[in-house]
């Protein structure tokens, strides 16, 4: 006789497979609805282009003409997507452009172009430089490169040999005899965002592999280095560089050439003195004349643990929100910008810096309906980045995002939180703003003058694991902490999770800032995308069904499919369906940035049927 078998919804990975009687223990590309498993919804790529860099922020909003916009912030470029087209609206450090003359140097047979500036620049390796139109270009002698090779094109900075030079890489080699400081053009510099990945405190890992940090200065060797203990140019104890400007000169310092680390104890003109080859666990090797030399004095040695856990490089993150039809965009630990969605030909304009706003903050949001712009982990003295306090909060005056000085006539103000070492993130809720430090939860409520906002600590030992690891749904906040999943509905609750060990036992906690939480209100789901212990990008997802879960049976399920993990997610409130991004670090494409080696991002629309990109997905559940 046939007998109907009943299985509880969700996965239970907290028990052995034999102990999970009448329960599902694993699956891929499935969800649970009405108590039964079904295929997750499909997805299709939006637009024909791929985006440069790793997407780390996504926000939807609408202008007064009902035009829908998606702001997508990658670690390279801030985009606005609308009508199937991506628009580069990234802010420029020099919006009017800067002309340089005697600028280009090339070598026959090489794609490398060296740009020389009339004064010190502040470019870092892998920053983006945009050249002006052809009218700003003057010819380069002894070169086959012409105006069309540069005009209105973006390039990624390949290296920074000195404080007055950078190199870029052309898509083809120089066929002329080679130019020396010839020609000129107008250039525009993109604001620096940060590395694509978050890396731990190991010398090689946190210097240039994941992106430039701490303003790492580069130059070149002036003379080859042999595979021996000597310096170059016949010296046993000195290495001659193209320039030593900016390199530290007191105490023991370090450079990296190729994969070899070298220490030095002094500087004389363009020479490093008192050198020792192959230090900090690196291997000695030969290096050619002109090889890139990087100042690694601020970094921990090869394979050596950092002196403290704060030596972890945050990835290039964005905080995105809107004040009405104006996009507000904050670079994590950097400046804040605005972009007017109602401007004439808005998609042809760029985001601009907000005058008077802090210039270094960890997070940002717009408080509604009172319309204050709030900065978290920000400066105690506006405009002085050295005063950034990771627990300090500053908010603008009501309806004026350029006024932050508290007076008797405005509602601007400040507050410092006490519990924790740094603010990790904040979310706007129905009844309050939720603020998480690395240890605690706080609420921030608008109360009007004279205090404007009231702050209250709502929980301890429940800090936020990463800036984007929390959401708010129907008056309840949900988040992922270092020690489990939590919910706040007026009281703090530790959530029972039947896949908790599976998630936390294989979680890359060094890359905690990559964790991204999103809502799918079409199915009542909250999903956290996270990196496993062997990955520096998000590779898995864990989902909580907030609509169908009960106190006795919380519904959780995971997805380890290589197709599904996302770097950002935004719900369906504006476009009608959820949107998300996937970062592919192994994809190297030029797009419109020559020399991009950091992979690309694809932008998807979800819940479009049951297939991905018109191809079937692998779906199963296992008992």
Residue ranges of model-derived segments:
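Beta-sheet repeat architectures centered on beta-propellers
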Residues: 1-96, 195-199, 317-319, 461-476, ...
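Beta-propeller and closely related beta-pinwheel folds
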Residues: 42-62, 90-95, 300-313, 345-515, ...
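Inter-blade boundary loops/turns of WD-repeat beta-propellers
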Residues: 63, 83, 134, 267, ...
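Structural hallmark of WD40 beta-propellers
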Residues: 66-69, 325, 431
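Short strand-coil-strand connectors
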Residues: 75, 83, 256-258, 332, ...
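Small/polar beta-strand repeat architecture
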Residues: 90-236, 242-316, 344-348, 352
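Beta-rich globular "head" domains
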Residues: 121-133, 373-376, 525-528, 617-623
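Hydrophobic or amphipathic alpha-helical targeting/insertion segments
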Residues: 191-196, 324-348
């Amino acid at each position: 006789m046939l007998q109907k078998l009943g299985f509880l919804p969700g996965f239970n990975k907290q028990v052995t497979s034999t102990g999970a009687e009448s329960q599902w223990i694993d699956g891929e590309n499935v969800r649970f609805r009405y108590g039964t498993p079904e295929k997750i919804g499909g997805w299709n790529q939006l637009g024909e282009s791929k985006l440069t860099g790793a997407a780390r922020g996504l926000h939807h909003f609408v202008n007064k003409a009902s035009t829908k916009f998606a702001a997508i912030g990658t670690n390279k470029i801030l985009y606005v997507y609308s009508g199937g087209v991506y628009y580069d609206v990234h802010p420029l450090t020099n919006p009017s452009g800067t002309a340089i003359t005697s600028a280009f140097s090339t070598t026959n047979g090489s794609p490398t172009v060296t740009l020389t500036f009339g004064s010190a620049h502040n470019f870092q390796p892998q920053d983006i430089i945009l050249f002006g139109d052809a009218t700003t270009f003057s010819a380069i002698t002894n070169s086959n490169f012409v105006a069309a090779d540069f005009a209105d094109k973006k390039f990624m900075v390949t290296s920074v040999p000195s404080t007055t030079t950078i190199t870029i890489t052309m898509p083809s080699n120089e066929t002329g005899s080679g130019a020396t400081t010839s020609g000129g053009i107008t250039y525009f510099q993109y604001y620096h965002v940060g590395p694509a990945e978050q890396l731990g405190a190991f010398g090689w890992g946190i210097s240039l592999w994941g992106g430039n940090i701490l303003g790492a200065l580069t130059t070149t060797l002036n003379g080859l280095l042999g595979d021996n203990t000597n310096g170059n140019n016949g010296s046993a104890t000195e290495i001659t560089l193209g320039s030593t400007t900016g390199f530290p000169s007191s105490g023991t310092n370090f450079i990296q050439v190729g994969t070899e680390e070298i220490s030095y104890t002094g500087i004389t003109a363009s020479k490093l003195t008192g050198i020792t080859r192959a230090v900090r666990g690196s291997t000695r090797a030969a290096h050619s004349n002109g090889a890139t030399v990087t100042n690694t004095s601020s970094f921990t040695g090869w394979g050596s643990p950092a002196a403290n856990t704060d030596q972890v490089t945050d990835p290039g993150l964005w905080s995105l929100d809107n004040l009405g039809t104006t996009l507000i965009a904050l670079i994590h630990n950097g400046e804040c910008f605005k972009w007017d969605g109602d401007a004439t030909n808005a998609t042809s304009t760029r985001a601009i810096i907000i005058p008077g706003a802090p210039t270094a903050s960890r997070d940002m949001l717009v408080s509604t309906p009172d319309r204050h712009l709030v900065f978290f982990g920000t400066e105690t003295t506006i405009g002085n980045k050295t005063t950034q306090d990771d627990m300090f909060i500053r908010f603008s005056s009501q309806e004026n995002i350029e006024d932050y000085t508290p007076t008797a006539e405005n509602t601007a103000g400040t507050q410092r939180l006490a519990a924790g070492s740094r603010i990790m993130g904040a979310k706007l809720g129905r009844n309050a703003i939720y603020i998480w430090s690395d240890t605690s939860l706080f609420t921030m409520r608008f109360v009007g003058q004279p205090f404007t906002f009231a702050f209250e600590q709502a929980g301890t030992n429940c800090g936020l694991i990463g800036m984007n690891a929390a959401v708010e749904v129907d008056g309840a906040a949900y988040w992922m902490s270092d020690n489990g999943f939590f919910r706040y509905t007026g009281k703090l609750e530790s959530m029972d999770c039947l896949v908790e060990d599976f998630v936390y036992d294989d979680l890359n906690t060094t890359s905690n800032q990559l964790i991204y939480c999103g809502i799918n209100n079409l199915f009542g789901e909250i999903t956290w995308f996270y990196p496993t212990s062997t990955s520096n990008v998000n590779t898995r997802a864990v989902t909580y069904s907030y609509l169908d879960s009960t106190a006795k049976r919380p519904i959780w399920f995971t997805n380890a499919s290589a197709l599904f993990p996302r770097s950002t997610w935004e719900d369906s409130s504006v476009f009608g369906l959820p949107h998300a991004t996937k970062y592919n670090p192994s994809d190297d494409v030029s797009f419109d940035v020559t020399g991009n080696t950091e992979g690309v991002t694809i932008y998807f629309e979800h819940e479009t049927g049951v297939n991905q990109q018109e191809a079937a997905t692998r779906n199963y559940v296992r008992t």
